[in-house]
Structures are given as C-alpha cells and as structure tokens.
Design a protein with these regions (language model features):
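Acidic low-complexity segments
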Residues: 2-29, 35-49, 93-183, 217-256, ...
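Short, compositionally biased leader-like segments
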Residues: 5-47, 266-297, 349-372
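N-terminal alpha-helical targeting/anchoring segments
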Residues: 48-103
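Conserved alpha/beta core surface patches that mediate binding of polyanionic ligands
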Residues: 48-64, 166-194, 324
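Short beta-strand elements
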Residues: 61-74, 182-210, 320-322
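Residue-level structural signal for beta-strand termini and adjacent loop
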Residues: 83-85, 208-209, 332
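Dual-mode signal for accessory low-complexity, basic/Gly-rich regions
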Residues: 123, 279-384
Length: 384
C-alpha cells in the first residue's frame, strides 16, 4: 500500500470539503441578504464497484456525485432548491429559486430551523474516514477470491449470482444561519457473495457480506465465500413442521427488520400523522421487561455514527427502551413542534441502536438454551 497514494486521496477529499464549506457559506450569505433564514447541506461522494460472476469480471463501475441542497425560510414559508454546480453564479441562482418557491408556499407554524441551542457547534471527530489504496485489479481480485471460495466449498453449490467489492468515500457539510458550519469525511467498504445450491432438483440461494468504514476491518474473502456457501447449503431439504407452540429466535438480520418497524412507529412523522400503533405510549411498557435498546451516535468508526443529524442538531446517547418501557420518541425539529416537544436529533434516521442481550451467549448458546424451537432466518411480506 502506497502511503503517497493515501495522502493524495485524503488531500483531494479535504480540498472538496473546503470547496463545499465555501459553497454552503456563500449560499447562507446570499439568503440572509435577502432577509431569509437558511440551511444548506452539501455532499460529495466517489466510489468503485467491481462485480464478478462464475469466475469472470462482470461489471466495473465508478461513481462521482455531488450536490448542494438549500432550504430557505421567509418567516414560516419554506422553499427548497438544489444544484450540482458549485459555481458562485449557480449557487446564487439556486438560492433565488428557493426564495421564489418560498413566496408561494403557505405559512406553516412548525416550519423553521432547529433551535440554535441544539446545534452541534462542537461536533466531535468520530474517525469515520479511512483511506484505502484500492484499484480495479485489487477489487476484482477480492471479488474473485470470494466467489471461488464459495464455489469450491461444496459440490452442491452449482451456480453463482456473483460477488462484489465496493469502496466509497465522501464528504458531508452542513451549515445554517445560526452560525453552524460543520463537516466530516467518511468511507465505507463492503464485500459480498450470493450463490445457489442444488439437491434433488431443488434450488436454494443465500448470501453473505462484510462491511466496514476501514478496509482492514473487513472479514476475509475466504470467510465471506465459505459462509455464503454454508448458509445456502443449510437451506436444502426443507421440511414442514407440525403446528405447535414453541420458542422463537430471529437471526440478527431478520431481527433488524423487526426493530426497524419499532423505529418507524416511534418516529415523529408517524406520530403526528397518527399513523403509528404506539400513539401515546411514551413512558409505557411496549416490550418485555428484559428488553433494552440504547442509541450511541458517537461510537468511534461505526457505520451509523454521526456527530449531528441532517438539521445540524447535536446527536447524543439516548435510552430508547429500558426494561421494556419506551423512553423517547424520535423527533426532528418539525415533528417535535407538531407534538409540542423538542428535536431529539433524528432528522435523517437513527444512529447505532444497541440491543442489550438478556443472555451472555451467542447464537449457538441461545440455540442450546432453547433446545427445541424455531430459528427464523428469513421473512416474507410487509408489515408486522
């Protein structure tokens, strides 16, 4: 790995970061001169994706995207506009477009910037960016090694849906007329594989993946490929089970989907629209008393870590569920005002939910403890 290459990558991102900061500052300045409050978010991202299928390179993709999103407030009238052109003239035209839109919108008592005292003026460095010296050849090698490991694992693996390696880096900048201007760099790397197994003319498929901010923290290509094959083979020879009452364990990927329904039900948008099954449940028992969820937005280097939300509100540790009791709603500034409450820093979503286990063992230990029951590996359909 070339240290010079990594330095150049980082220097380029830092240059883009400064360009975005300048663009955000200019947009806010133009809006303020027109008598409006403003918030501006800027992003710049680039990446490489290489996929293989049946031991041959199938696709190589490069991406390079950037945008500036501008929201202005004339009193409580709001206008939005965006541009991918960061020239001063384009920024001026975009702000003017947002102002023109705002003049034709109806006033909304809940519209406006998030409260100034909630801003992340002192946003911490969460170590979200790790440069990697990765090119097409190395990315293809990783994908091919992954797929080969899966195909060679067992003769029942008869086909492949492919393997892929993805590398992504980006810059995020946010500013508003409260004087907030913060930014950070980020990276994300992933390696995945999906294969097909056959037994007595019955086909099954499954997959495996690894993802991290740091390429050196990814699981090996061998691990991803063999796990994809092993999970696929485990699906062969399915059997019907008799109707019965039994304990149930959800695999972590499936459980994440279930927990996302909880997050949606306690989000401010669902609550003020009265589209939630947990209306008026704050402080009430919603889950078993052994169930706990906490949110940790500032964990170093984690995928869902962020120092501030998409409104610039400082993120903070929260207890979401404690002993089965709902401790907080998930609010933006708008939904908070609709409900007569304060933003909780959730514009843009949730950040690192940690489910505290009620058992010290991992899956194998849980299965031994269950003795006989149902392990749910996949669900179909929508809703809960």
């Amino acid at each position: 790995m070339s240290a010079k290459t990594l330095e150049n990558q980082t220097a380029l991102l830092q240059q883009q970061e400064q360009q975005l900061r300048d663009a955000v500052s200019l947009a806010i300045e133009i809006a303020q001169k027109a008598g409006a409050a403003a918030e501006v978010g800027g992003t710049k991202s680039g990446g490489l994706s290489v996929s293989t299928r049946l031991k041959e390179i199938e696709n190589v993709e490069f991406n390079n995207d950037g945008a500036l999103g501008i929201s202005v407030y004339l009193g409580q009238q709001k206008g939005n506009a965006s541009t991918s052109d960061l020239s001063p003239e384009a920024i001026k035209n975009t702000v003017e477009a947002a102002l023109a839109i705002a003049k034709y919108t109806s006033p909304d008592d809940c519209a406006g910037l998030a409260d100034k005292e909630l801003m992340a003026f002192d946003a911490p460095d969460l170590d979200l960016y790790h440069a990697a010296d990765i090119d097409v050849d190395r990315a293809a090698q990783l994908a091919l090694e992954t797929e080969n490991a899966a195909l060679e694992f067992d003769k029942r693996i008869v086909n492949s849906e492919g393997a892929s390696f993805n590398a992504h880096t980006g810059v995020r900048v946010y500013g508003n007329s409260h004087g907030m201007l913060q930014s950070y760099l980020s990276s994300r790397y992933s390696l995945s594989c999906s294969v097909i197994a056959e037994h007595e003319n019955q086909l099954e498929r499954d997959y495996e993946y690894t993802v991290s901010r740091n390429i050196n923290s990814l699981e090996s290509a061998q691990w991803v490929g063999e796990n994809a094959a092993q999970k696929t083979i485990a699906r062969l020879q399915p059997q019907k089970i008799a109707t019965q009452q039994a304990p149930v364990i959800f695999l972590n990927d499936v459980a994440t989907g279930l927990i996302s329904h909880l997050a949606s039900a306690i989000s401010g948008g669902s609550l003020y629209r009265k589209a939630s099954f947990l209306l008026a449940h704050l402080g009430k028992q919603v889950l078993p008393d052994w169930f706990h969820i906490s949110e940790k937005p500032h964990l170093i280097g984690r995928l869902a870590s962020t120092p501030f939300d998409s409104e610039g509100v400082r993120t903070q540790d929260l207890e979401v569920i404690r002993q089965g009791i709902l401790q907080t709603y998930l609010l933006t500034s708008y939904s908070g005002r609709k409900l007569g409450m304060q933003s909780t820093g959730h514009a843009g979503g949730i950040h690192n939910w940690l489910v505290q286990p009620n058992s010290s063992g991992k899956l194998t230990a849980l299965l031994h403890q269950m003795e006989r029951g149902l392990l749910v590996t996949e669900v179909m359909g929508q809703g809960v």
